């Protein structure tokens, strides 16, 4: 899978702004990220922040690639209408809603038939 658009940010708000501007018009993007407790020497966002911002805008994470220079790039793309939702991501969305971070696009992507009252 080819990396067509690579985003590299230090600040979660920069990714949020990009997704707010492009969530309805782009097919995908790749975001430089890291996993673990120690931040790398280059600009990158923690994996959880990348995933949360994707969910806030109706997108999902998929492929993770290591770039030739050692950086990790996480692919994000819009969710398909009838895609499978894990309990983890549904619960993340509910938490993001409680925190006031969900957008209208993110809410529209959540499968209401999979959310029950016990999760709220």
List the model feature ranges, each with a label:
Residues 1-120:
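Charge-dense, helix-prone N-terminal extensions
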């Amino acid at each position: 899978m080819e990396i067509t658009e690579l985003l590299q940010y230090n600040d979660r708000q920069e990714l949020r702004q990009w997704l707010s501007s492009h969530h309805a018009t782009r097919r995908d993007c790749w975001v430089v990220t890291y996993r673990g407790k120690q931040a790398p020497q280059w600009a990158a966002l923690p994996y959880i922040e990348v995933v949360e911002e994707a969910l806030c805008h109706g997108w999902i994470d998929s492929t993770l690639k290591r770039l030739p220079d050692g950086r990790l790039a996480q692919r994000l793309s819009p969710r398909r209408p009838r895609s499978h939702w894990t309990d983890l991501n549904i619960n993340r969305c509910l938490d993001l809603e409680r925190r006031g971070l969900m957008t209208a696009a993110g809410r529209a992507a959540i499968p209401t038939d999979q959310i029950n009252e016990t999760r709220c």
